[in-house]
């Protein structure tokens, strides 16, 4: 008799996605991050749902409701810190996942790649709005500064900002709508994830060599389910260690002061996972130029497939491209560090050099070095 998982209308979809899915036999640990992102998303939606049961989206009570969750709700502090640090784990996995795609040439599956970029924007928007909800000093001023960037758009900028704020400043209306969007966006992310997987399963996974793996495929279960479970355990161990031993490690101390429109914090900065983009924004003295650079720092990923000039897909056998890739990683880490520093010498000039390098590596050096490699290999 045929197994029910292969005949049942719902189960056969799951079966073809997670059980009998043909997968390349040589996938490395870098292919774990897709499933880790799924776990992060599920954990964020669950903890967020329970937090929303106790949170009030009102300027007068938002800060106190978060304090109430931590002090009075059973294991509320665990929920709150799992959610806050879970976001950090989410972004670590996201950046490693994108980095894997860049290194191994997975971006040549352009539909999957472009849906992935949409997902990245959606998750970033969700995280930004979530950071506003505790209504601390950094929540309020972060929301004010980042939404104000839209005023750089010619003609409609000022009206657009006031429309988003729901008034003439960040206030109750802003907080309420941000809570609504923060609750809604993760479900849009789930829908996008399904489309992402749909397109991925049309082509099948790439593999570290970048060579078609059709002659050598193995079933996803049990080979990769067991590898994924190991990944889950490692990630959950790191997350629980962070939550239970130093939950505020990645937080900003300013956010433990209730929002005060009359008192500006000395250094307004976003969460650590946005610092690289914030550094690029700050490195350009012109407001509109900075906003464009900020958007392009992520949007540049869209044209990466077009700039692929190598005859090989993966960087596995391309040592020159590998050096350049790790140089790009170092540049991003430098930008992350600069984003958290005050706007003064020498940080400004380091940020400007790193920003120029970031765009130059992706737009100029990567395609050129690939052409050089082709020439050296007589291709």
UniProtKB/Swiss-Prot annotation:
A GO term from the CC aspect: respiratory chain complex III
Record text on cofactor binding: Binds 2 heme b groups non-covalently.
Binding residue positions for a ubiquinone: 201
GO molecular function, one term: metal ion binding
Cofactor(s) named in the record: heme b
Pfam families noted in UniProt: Cytochrom_B_C (PF00032), Cytochrome_B (PF00033)
Major location category of this protein: mitochondrion
Membrane topology: Multi-pass membrane protein
Transmembrane intervals: 33-53, 77-98, 113-133, 178-198, 226-246, 288-308, 320-340, 347-367
CDD domains cross-referenced by the UniProt entry: cytochrome_b_C, Cytochrome_b_N
Binding site for heme b b566: 97, 196
Residues annotated for heme b b562 binding in this entry: 83, 182
Gene Ontology biological process: mitochondrial electron transport, ubiquinol to cytochrome c
Alphabetical keyword list: Electron transport, Heme, Iron, Membrane, Metal-binding, Mitochondrion, Mitochondrion inner membrane, Respiratory chain, Transmembrane, Transmembrane helix, Transport, Ubiquinone
Subcellular localization(s) per the UniProt record: Mitochondrion inner membrane
Domain of life: Eukaryota
Gene3D superfamilies xrefs: Cytochrome Bc1 Complex, Chain C
Further details from the record: Heme 1 (or BL or b562) is low-potential and absorbs at about 562 nm, and heme 2 (or BH or b566) is high-potential and absorbs at about 566 nm.
Subunit structure: The cytochrome bc1 complex contains 11 subunits: 3 respiratory subunits (MT-CYB, CYC1 and UQCRFS1), 2 core proteins (UQCRC1 and UQCRC2) and 6 low-molecular weight proteins (UQCRH/QCR6, UQCRB/QCR7, UQCRQ/QCR8, UQCR10/QCR9, UQCR11/QCR10 and a cleavage product of UQCRFS1). This cytochrome bc1 complex then forms a dimer.
Function, as annotated: Component of the ubiquinol-cytochrome c reductase complex (complex III or cytochrome b-c1 complex) that is part of the mitochondrial respiratory chain. The b-c1 complex mediates electron transfer from ubiquinol to cytochrome c. Contributes to the generation of a proton gradient across the mitochondrial membrane that is then used for ATP synthesis.
Family designation: Belongs to the cytochrome b family.
Protein name: Cytochrome b
Organism: Platalina genovensium
């Amino acid at each position: 008799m045929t197994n029910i998982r292969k005949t049942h209308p719902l189960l056969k979809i799951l079966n073809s996605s997670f059980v009998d899915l043909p997968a390349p036999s040589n996938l490395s640990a870098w292919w774990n991050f897709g499933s880790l992102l799924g776990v992060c998303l599920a954990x964020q939606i669950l903890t967020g749902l329970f937090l929303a049961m106790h949170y009030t989206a009102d300027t007068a009570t938002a800060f106190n409701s978060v304090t109430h969750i931590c002090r009075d709700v059973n294991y509320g502090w665990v929920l709150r810190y799992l959610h806050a640090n879970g976001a950090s784990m989410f972004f670590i996995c996201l950046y490693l996942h994108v980095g894997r795609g860049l290194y191994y040439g997975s971006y040549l599956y352009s539909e999957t790649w472009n849906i992935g970029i949409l997902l990245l924007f959606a998750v970033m928007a969700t995280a930004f709005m979530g950071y506003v909800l505790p209504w601390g000093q950094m929540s309020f001023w972060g929301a004010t500064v980042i939404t104000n960037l839209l005023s750089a758009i010619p003609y409609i900028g000022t009206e657009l900002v006031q429309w988003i704020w729901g008034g003439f400043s960040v206030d109750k209306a802003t907080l309420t709508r941000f809570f609504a969007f923060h609750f809604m966006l993760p479900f849009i992310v789930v829908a996008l994830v399904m489309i992402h997987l749909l397109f991925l399963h049309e082509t099948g996974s790439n593999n570290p060599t970048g060579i078609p793996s059709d002659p050598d495929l193995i079933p996803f279960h049990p080979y990769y389910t067991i590898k994924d479970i190991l990944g889950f355990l490692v990630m959950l161990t790191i997350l629980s260690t962070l939550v239970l031993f130093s939950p505020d490690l990645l937080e900003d101390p300013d956010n433990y002061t209730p929002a005060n429109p009359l008192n500006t914090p000395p250094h307004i900065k976003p969460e650590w996972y946005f610092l690289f983009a914030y550094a690029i924004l700050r490195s350009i003295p012109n407001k509109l130029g900075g906003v464009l650079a900020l958007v392009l720092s992520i949007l540049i990923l869209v044209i990466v497939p077009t700039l692929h000039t190598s005859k090989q897909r993966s960087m596995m056998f391309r040592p020159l491209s590998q050096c350049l890739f790790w140089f790009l990683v170092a540049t991003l880490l430098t930008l992350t560090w600069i984003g958290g520093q005050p706007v003064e010498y020498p940080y400004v000039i380091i940020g400007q050099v790193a920003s120029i390098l970031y765009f130059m590596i992706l737009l100029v050096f990567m395609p050129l070095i690939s052409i050089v490699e082709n020439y050296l290999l007589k291709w």
